[in-house]
Amino acid sequence: MSLDFLILYEHTVREYESDLLLKLELEKRGYTAEIRQLLDPKRLKYFTWKKPKVLVSSCMYDNEAINSHVYNNIGRCNRIVNLHWEQMLSDTQEEGDWFNFSGNAKKCIQTCWGSRTARRLMDHGMEEKNCPVTGAVMMDFLRPEFRGYFEGKEALCRRFGLDPVHHLHLYISSFGYASMTEEEVKSLSEMAGTDFSGFARTNRVSMEQTLAWFDRYLAEHPEVDLVYRRHPSEWNSPQLEELAARRPNFHVIFAGSVKEWIVAADSISIWMSTSIAEVYMAGKSCLILRPVPIEHEYDPVIYKGGQYRTTYEEFAAGMAEENPEFPIPKEVIEGYFDPSPRPAYLRMADLLEQVYTQPPRDEPMGPGFTPHFNWLKYFALWGVHLLFALHLEPRKVFFFHKGLADFAQRIYGYVEKAHVSPAQVRAMEERIRPFVEGGEKA
């Protein structure tokens, strides 16, 4: 029996919850759907008796991506829908070639969260039929239809040992470069072909001054608990440890999703995180803290024209406001995140149904595309997954060959980070299913 939809994900935290919501809706409509990770071993069944009718990808930038993500997973297929997870870009990225797709990737269906992204893609040569606006599925969990999906403030505070009576302020950090050494920044710059030294300096200065603001404010306001939601790459930060030791109402917490902290928080501040869109979709406001300007080539374009708090006094004044105005113009944020009265997962499922039932809109694997099967990757993935199942790290197994050990260990790290256990999947399904079943009737 063939499979109707195969959904591929890359980053678990970013994508899996939304993919599962979409899968459950498709199953509710009577279709078959499965979710797999991009680095899962290739399986014969997806090329033969269980070949999917529609391939739903997480990214699809060029012909090599079509080959790697589609051809090497299921063979030939012209029904390719990209969930297009990277849409919050800087102005430099929006103008460049990579994020506007090349080759036959322009013939795939590149879904768009809002009209501004669709217009940009059309300005760069895509046809309107291939860049439909669906809204952002991950934002649906913040809609009124999903009320009760996240814990309330009291339950969340008790889970993390915070006083629910206190004012809960959430800071969403993006200081990923602040904890990197000069040598690490240099190495990253050489690898990417871009000099990140200036932006790393902006990270450090911004973090230092922001923490100074928090230190002063928390000393004056013991009734406020500030939860510092660190960036995933913010590690080994003595500044955070020192402030947490000095101020008992400063808490560095990474556990829990950023969405549930947004829903629970009494007030929110942010630097340059794209989570500002989630704040808006949750019906809340926030303060944009910018002690120093951010280089435009790194600043998400959604922040353009925003209202920044650049001094401690402006930050403190914002904290005193009961309902501060949202710092980004409505037309800008809704241009990137379509505010349809209908949830995005339903609109996305509608699109997938159309793609399934109608002839292919285009030919991504037609002229201009040359398929090739990557046998090295095929055997490497099976080998690494075997080591992962046996809990054997490649650097220990291949100690006799540094090059092989490093190569296999890198893939092993990706596999380990993306792994979702069957128990975790069941728990997420049980949590999401009631909202799908109670939603729009099929």
What are these model-predicted stretches?
Residues 227-277, 282:
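Donor nucleotide-activated moiety binding/catalytic core segment of transferases
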Residues 108, 131, 249-251, 306-307:
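Short, conserved active-site loop motifs that form the nucleotide-linked donor/cofactor pocket
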Residues 147-242:
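Conserved catalytic-core segment of nucleotide-activated headgroup transferases in glycan assembly
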Residues 242-245, 267, 274-342:
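Catalytic binding pocket for nucleotide-activated donors in carbohydrate/polymer assembly enzymes
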Residues 4-150, 174, 234, 276:
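Active-site and donor-binding regions of nucleotide-sugar-utilizing enzymes
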Residues 53-55, 105-110, 225-226, 264-267, ...:
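Short active-site oxyanion
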Residues 44-50, 158-160, 318-322:
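Short amphipathic alpha-helix with an adjacent loop that forms part of the alpha/beta core around
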